[in-house]
Design a protein with these regions (language model features):
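Long, contiguous amphipathic alpha-helices that act as assembly "spine/axial" helices in icosahedral shell
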Residues: 1-65, 80, 84, 90-110, ...
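Non-transmembrane, interaction-prone segments in cytosolic or luminal domains
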Residues: 4-7, 27-28, 33-39, 43, ...
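Generic serine detector
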Residues: 6, 13, 24, 30, ...
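Flexible, active-site-adjacent loop/turn segments at secondary-structure boundaries
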Residues: 46, 56-59, 72, 117, ...
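Amphipathic alpha-helical segments that form coiled-coils or helix-hairpins used
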Residues: 63-75
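A contiguous, surface-oriented mixed alpha/beta subdomain in the mid-to-C-terminal portion of proteins
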Residues: 73, 79-172
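Sequence/fold signature of self-assembling virion shell proteins
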Residues: 126-248
């Protein structure tokens, strides 16, 4: 709708240029948000849903149950809840196997509700909490953490805890008072992958394997249109090493 731009830009060419730029940025934001949702689903939902890919939906668990640990009493003042977390991390090492465990560079806990509150304020572990800056992450969750300063994060004994209570798209996978323990892996291990593909909407453009493809086309009357397509497939190769639990 060029009418809204023509009030500020009397020159029609200028108005069309600004409109195209605005639509281009809006398209990119929309597609980036969609990619982030699918990365979360691959990492914490352990699947990829697809309406168009020839292989259909991908279940990284291949029908198996996800790895869980017993509920943890984060309100306990007699038994340190962090001991249960360390036990869960050891279970994660078993699921990874010795080869991949050696390539683990860190651990991130996505926690919500009572789990997040308990990890940050339980008196038995409060002296272990050291508030830090943005969590360092790699692979799939680089986009989720590093580019989202809204996430509250802190450190407990070398483990990064991220409070995601206010992010329903993540809480939907871990539960309102749940948590997920995710290993941060060396990129060379290729445990988390984001494959990019070619575009299909244009006969000549978009033939490189990149995440986003965007084209500017004009109709017979030279009115421009912005076309954006995103071709990607996130892959989680260590779904059993993502440990899930909840607050008791």
């Amino acid at each position: 709708d060029l009418e809204q731009y023509s009030r500020q830009y009397p020159n029609r060419s200028d108005a069309m240029l600004v409109a195209v730029n605005d639509f281009s940025e809006a398209h990119y934001r929309s597609h980036a948000n969609r990619v982030e949702v699918d990365l979360i689903t691959a990492l914490l939902g352990l699947k990829v849903e697809s309406e168009y890919a020839g292989q259909g939906d991908l279940d990284f668990l291949d029908g198996q149950a996800k790895t869980t640990v017993p509920a943890i009493d984060f309100a306990s003042t007699t038994v340190n809840p962090f001991l249960a977390i360390r036990k869960a991390v050891r279970l994660q090492s078993e699921k990874l196997g010795s080869g991949l465990a050696a390539k683990r560079t860190g651990v991130i806990i996505f926690a919500a509700g009572a789990a997040a509150d308990g990890l940050s304020s339980n008196p038995l572990i409060s002296d272990m909490v050291k508030y830090a800056g943005d969590a360092s992450a790699t692979a799939l969750f680089t986009r989720m953490v590093d580019s989202n300063p809204a996430y509250d994060s802190f450190q407990i004994g070398g483990i990064t805890v991220i409070d995601v209570s206010m992010f329903p798209e993540i809480v939907a996978h871990i539960g309102e008072n749940g948590f997920a323990i995710v290993p941060v892996m060396d990129k060379a291990a290729q445990c988390y992958q984001l494959h990019s593909g070619v575009g299909v909407r244009h006969a000549e453009l978009g033939q490189d394997a990149v995440l986003h493809h965007q084209y500017l086309i004009k109709d017979e009357f030279q009115f421009p249109s912005v076309v954006t397509e995103t071709s990607y497939l996130p892959v989680n190769n260590i779904p059993q090493a993502i440990i899930f639990g909840s607050a008791a």
